[in-house]
Design a protein with these regions (language model features):
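Extreme N-terminal basic, low-complexity initiation segments
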Residues: 1-13
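Position-driven detector of the extreme protein N-terminus
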Residues: 2-3, 23, 98
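Intrinsically disordered, low-complexity, charge-rich segments with an acidic bias
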Residues: 2-5, 43, 50
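Short hydrophobic targeting helices and cationic amphipathic motifs
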Residues: 7, 38-42, 69
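Short, low-complexity, intrinsically disordered N-terminal modules
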Residues: 8-10, 22, 51
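All-alpha prenyltransferase/terpene-synthase fold signal
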Residues: 15, 27-33, 45-404
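Tryptophan (W) side chains
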Residues: 19-22, 38
Length: 404
């Protein structure tokens, strides 16, 4: 990673207090207005830590969440919007990821040409591959030396891809990862059936791993994900959804597969019960953070960078966290605007975006994501320090500071 420039001009006096050997707080007295929050970059021992207390600025579009340590011996400040480079984060497992891609390509083989065509289309669209990377990274972080993690990482990617195929049909989406969705290209029926094929193929591959515990984790995950899909369906066009009810959907629909991916990696490595629980907690909370940032990006991101239409959640009548916050904290007029937008899926996007901005809804969602990432980071304290543990920590930074 290219080290960011030191940014101190105009920031006034910086005070740092240490607690328990870790940087716990950054206090700042500011001369004049500062148009962004700052995260801090403390080079120590190549370990990444998330601060519990951060400085605030009302005009910040994105809040800082993380600090990154390297062995250069000095403190730097970096903008809150600083985005980590995902390929660099997964560099320690780059060979493993290539092996996983080979497994994916091989296991997509089918005598039915349409299955290969659709599966190749959606898998070939790319994506972050965070879930399979999590299997690999957690297994390596706990000392795994075999190669079954390639198979299981591919299983996790197949499950994820199946959910995308089904999601796009349910949501009637037409754009994903910067190109037409599979259902837009090949029709709803074919997309659903190929999703079913990928689920079936993933279970076939699970059996090869020879672990009932791993099968239990992944089969439970697929059940919970399906429950999350149904819960989300019940929430659509309902403006009275609470934050807790929404977060239940996030935990079921999105975070559960992150949780399963990390947990499978731990089990494969022969983790203790305590390590397995910590791995599951890490995945669950980083998955939640990931989805909450998606909520933010749906109202603040760029369609080309995201690879999907900005405002899709609103058009689909989905009450995500920014909208729920306006319903709870907005003026009567703002609440009525959002209520109508959720109920109809047809509203003035600019007016909705202004209500979200005025109530600080994006900042609230970003802070919630940062809090989840902090919990994920602390779950990794049980792991031995290694390049793999460091990358898992850096995933926390990527999850909350990404722009796509």
């Amino acid at each position: 990673m290219t080290e960011p420039k030191i940014l101190t001009r105009g920031c006034g006096k910086v005070k740092i207090s240490l607690w328990g050997g870790w940087l716990a707080r950054l206090e700042r007295s500011v001369r004049g207005a500062v148009p962004a929050c700052w995260a801090f970059y403390l080079p120590v021992a190549s370990v990444l830590v998330i601060p519990r207390i951060i400085c605030e600025a009302p005009t910040a579009a994105r809040l800082p969440a993380l600090i990154h340590h390297r062995a250069s011996g000095r403190l730097s400040l970096i903008p809150a919007g600083y985005v980590l480079n995902l390929p660099e984060l997964i560099a320690p497992i780059s060979d493993d990821m290539k092996a996983v891609d080979a497994v994916i390509r091989g296991r997509l083989d089918s005598e039915v040409v349409l299955i290969r065509t659709i599966a190749d289309y959606i898998i070939g669209a790319g994506g972050k591959r965070m879930r399979p990377a999590m299997v690999l990274m957690m297994a390596r972080a706990l000392g795994y030396q075999g190669d079954h993690h390639h198979l299981l990482a591919a299983v996790v990617e197949f499950i994820h891809t199946a959910t995308l195929l089904h999601d796009d049909v349910v949501d009637e989406s037409d754009l994903r990862r910067g190109r037409e969705t599979a259902n837009a290209m090949f029709g709803n029926a074919a997309s659903v059936l190929v999703g079913d094929y990928l689920y079936s193929r993933s279970f076939e591959m699970m059996v090869e791993a020879g672990s009932m515990r791993i099968m239990q984790i992944l089969s439970e995950a697929t059940t919970v994900i399906a429950e999350g899909e149904v819960l989300q369906l019940l929430n659509v066009h309902d403006p009275d959804v609470s934050q807790e009810r929404y977060l239940q959907v996030v935990r079921y629909k999105t975070a559960k597969l992150f949780e399963a991916a990390a947990q499978v990696g731990a089990v494969l490595a022969g983790a203790t019960a305590e390590q397995e629980a910590a791995a599951a907690a890490y995945g669950r909370h980083i998955g939640t953070a990931f989805q909450l940032v998606d909520d933010v990006l749906d109202y603040s991101g760029d369609a080309q960078a995201l690879g999907k239409n900005v405002g899709d959640d609103l058009r689909e009548g989905k009450p995500t966290l920014p909208l729920i916050w306006v319903m709870e904290q907005g003026t009567p007029a703002q609440r009525e605007l959002i209520r109508n937008a959720i109920q109809t899926g047809d509203a003035d996007f600019a007016a909705v975006a202004e209500a979200i901005r005025a109530t600080g809804a994006l900042e609230h969602a970003q802070q919630a994501a940062s809090a989840e990432a902090d919990i994920a980071r602390r779950a990794l304290d049980i792991l031995p320090i290694s390049v793999y543990q460091k990358s898992l920590l850096e995933f926390c930074a990527f999850a909350v500071n990404r722009d796509r």
